[in-house]
Amino acid sequence: GQIEHLGRSYAATDTSNYSVVGFGDIVYTKSPTGDFPYGIIKQSHIQDNVAVSPLYGVYIPVNYWLGYILHTYFQYAVNVTNYLLPIVHKGAKNTINISNEVFLSNSLYLPMDEEEQKRISELFIVVDREISLLQKDLEQEKLKKKVLMQLLLTGIVRVSA
């Protein structure tokens, strides 16, 4: 069947061992990238269910809020490394071998009260939105600077002393 991931379609001959990722699920990408030598752990914010290959670990948190706390915690490479280093085995060609059971075998100190989880994650959500807006503002300012520099360098705009 056709598998769609990140806007691209892939043909897979056998999808029987694929996992379904739902909104709010935690997804572990078992491939090293950049600052994340043991892979990336994120919460899915895609509204629709998505099929993913067995190269991804898919975990359903107790609730969305706890998932968001984990998503925020694992945004930092040091946290992912500290969590996975003791339990992961790197194989040939840097492949990461870890079962779902082993992935869940490590522990973190997390709030257990759902109301507390909700309040903490709502704070993270507000902060994430603020950061996103500030990044967009920064990109706009960089664009303005670029346009102004082009205008100045071409002599279209002159600065008076």
Predicted regions, residues:
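A short beta-sheet element
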Residues: 19-79, 99
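A short glycine-rich beta-alpha junction/loop motif
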Residues: 49-55, 89-115
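Short, solvent-exposed loop/turn positions at domain surfaces
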Residues: 9-15, 92, 114, 125
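Sequence-specific dsDNA recognition surfaces
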Residues: 1-27
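Surface-exposed receptor/substrate recognition regions of extracellular proteins
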Residues: 84
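Short glycine/proline-centered loop/turn elements that form peptide/ligand docking sites
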Residues: 2-3, 33, 141
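Amphipathic alpha-helical coiled-coil/heptad-repeat segments
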Residues: 110-161
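Short, solvent-exposed alpha-helical surface patches in well-structured domains
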Residues: 69-72, 105, 119
